[in-house]
Curated annotation (Swiss-Prot):
Protein name: Enterobactin synthase component D
Pathway it works in: Siderophore biosynthesis; enterobactin biosynthesis
A molecular function GO annotation: holo-[acyl-carrier-protein] synthase activity
Organism listed in the record: Salmonella typhimurium (strain LT2 / SGSC1412 / ATCC 700720)
Family: Belongs to the P-Pant transferase superfamily. EntD family.
């Protein structure tokens, strides 16, 4: 499969972005994956996306001297080497991965159309969150896509500790040109309730990328700093 890779520094980490041509995918491209047999029943598009994600992950792992391919767990989650955390995401013809020594979550989403945003908004945000998104002055489809993506990133960062929390288990508390903050509710995980997560974001073409790598250890307070992460100039 034809791919191109480039690293991108962001929020104190290095993202590994792989653009790929799914039409060039061939079945034998999967053979270098240790778990290729488990992908046998997947569709062609899914196979291409999975392959691109693992290619990005291999580039990320090489940064820390690891030369293995992340396996696939019982829930189809990536299996990272001991002592490391990682995250993979893909959308359309782009996959990306990041590696860290602390919990991390990353997500990429195509910016919703106005019609899609109007249709999906009630399942992603509540009325309070809608007001925050509208107050950001970002176009609503972009703001809603960011809310969706940020919640996905937070789930990925803690996927081994939570079981498919709904979108109403984390609430948007602020949205700026560089970050979106979320307040975790008991429905997310009782042990993390009333904590705040700040997710960094940027736009790449018609997609957004969100990344979370820290959670505050203090109760939610809108007047207090939301994260130990620094904002990234854009």
């Amino acid at each position: 499969m034809l791919t191109s890779h480039f690293p991108l520094p962001f929020a104190g980490h290095r993202l590994h972005i792989v653009d790929f041509d799914a039409s060039s995918f061939r079945e034998h491209d999967l053979l270098w994956l240790p778990h290729h047999d488990r992908l046998r029943s997947a569709g062609r598009k899914r196979k291409a996306e999975h392959l691109a994600g693992r290619i990005a992950a291999v580039h990320a792992l090489r940064e820390v001297g690891v030369r293995t391919v992340p396996g696939m767990g019982d829930k189809r989650q990536p299996l990272w080497p001991d002592g490391l955390f990682g995250s993979i995401s893909h959308c359309a013809t782009t996959a990306l991965a990041v590696i860290s020594r602390q919990r991390i979550g990353i997500d990429i989403e195509k910016i919703m159309s106005q019609h899609t945003a109007t249709e999906l908004a009630p399942s992603i945000i509540d009325s309070d969150e809608r007001q925050i998104l509208q107050a950001s002055l970002l176009p609503f489809p972009l703001a809603l896509t960011l809310a969706f993506s940020a919640k996905e990133s937070v789930y990925k960062a803690f996927s081994d500790r939570v079981t498919l929390p709904g979108f109403n288990s984390a609430k948007v508390t602020s949205l700026t040109a560089t970050h979106i903050s979320l307040h975790l509710l008991p429905a997310f995980a009782a042990t993390m309730a009333e904590r705040t997560v700040r997710t960094e974001w940027f736009q790449r073409d018609n997609s957004v990328i969100t990344l979370v790598s820290a959670i505050t250890r203090v109760p939610h307070d809108r007047s207090a700093p939301a994260s130990i992460l620094s904002a990234i100039p854009r």
